[in-house]
UniProtKB/Swiss-Prot annotation:
Its EC number is 2.4.2.7. Pathway: Purine metabolism; AMP biosynthesis via salvage pathway; AMP from adenine: step 1/1. It comes from the Bacteria. InterPro entries: Ade_phspho_trans, PRibTrfase_dom, PRTase-like, UPRTase/APRTase. Catalyzes a salvage reaction resulting in the formation of AMP, that is energically less costly than de novo synthesis. Homodimer. One of its GO terms (cellular component) is cytoplasm. Its main location: cytoplasm. It comes from Lactococcus lactis subsp. lactis (strain IL1403). Belongs to the purine/pyrimidine phosphoribosyltransferase family. This is Adenine phosphoribosyltransferase. It catalyses: AMP + diphosphate = 5-phospho-alpha-D-ribose 1-diphosphate + adenine. SUPFAM superfamilies: PRTase-like (SSF53271). It is found in: Cytoplasm.
């Protein structure tokens, strides 16, 4: 299946000069959505995953069906003020300033094997902060999976030596 057929390209969104890759058509097509999730599940099967972690919001959309198929839990990564219990946080640099991500401080148990799933790998800030959060709790990041990588933004450099899978490159 050619997954790129299910990605809408929107010029100048959310601001002038940006090309937005919209996964909504993929999510709206049951076969394409299932195919994408299954590809990530196949990547993760032999990694003995204990937990799937996904940054909001589109990491939830892909991560939850993957966790379900693997028979493991899902832990959300959210922006500050969105989680009701004690959290840990990681701050990362963006083009114009910084951003912070949080997780419940008991989301990951020491030694748990974690797969991080998100829709998009762009500059790598979100994935780097998510890896930091998992490792602060003693989790072991055994893989990262993305629907899309924007190659020119070089986000893979922030992943370093972590194993990862990408379904589509732009």
């Amino acid at each position: 299946m050619e997954l790129k057929d299910y990605i809408a390209t929107i010029e100048n969104y959310p601001k002038e000069g940006v090309v937005f890759r919209d996964i909504s058509p993929l999510m709206a097509d049951g076969n394409a959505y299932n195919y994408a999730a299954t590809e990530i599940v196949q990547y993760a099967r032999d990694k003995e995953i204990d937990m799937v972690v996904g940054p909001e919001a589109r990491g939830f959309i892909i991560g939850c069906p993957v966790a379900f198929a693997l028979g493991v839990g899902f832990a959300p990564v959210r922006k500050p003020g969105k989680l009701p219990r004690e959290v840990i946080e990681a701050t990362y640099e963006k083009e114009y300033g910084t951003d912070t991500l949080t997780m419940h401080s008991d989301s990951i148990k020491p030694g748990q094997r974690v797969l991080i799933v998100d829709d998009l790998l762009a500059t790598g800030g979100t994935i780097a902060a998510t890896i930091e959060l998992v490792e602060k709790m003693g989790g072991i990041v055994v893989g990262c999976a993305f629907l899309i990588e924007l190659d020119e933004l070089k986000g893979r450099e922030k992943i370093g030596d972590y194993d990862y899978k990408v379904l589509m490159h732009y």
